[in-house]
């Protein structure tokens, strides 16, 4: 069966993003963002060096898209779904920083729904869409399930795992050429807010974390 992956984004307001977007940043990726541009997948892999990098590597290994359909798309705060190889510059990243991924953000919701409907048509009926992202809230599932129905799948192994654990799992699967088990998203129920708090990272001083800390949105 054909399979397309949709990935949740990296955090565009995290420590690494702020460091990269400084006017005096001399990093190679910051200079390219000011010039010819950088692919969206590479930018988000830099911002989230474990979780997003693991998602992208996994999707690149196991995507089997139908013809004339991208195999990997990334959810963005302001532009709906974008192929991972889309070239972006600083202005686009600044726009992402201003967007909020939340079901009450009408611009985020309308952009995602619009691009998801287009993807659903491109995919056809014999193709699965696998979400690599948070299952704990409705910010992705509530918007995608009505459009894709039974075609929307999620990794069974993601249920109950934190984002750092997922990143390591995905990279191991790539090394072992081992695919995860996918279940229908219709069977997944978002966790209540108390359970989500219990699963969150216990970080008392986030600003003290080193630059390698994984800035992911889940």
Give the label of every model feature segment:
Residues 1-218:
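Peripheral peptide segments
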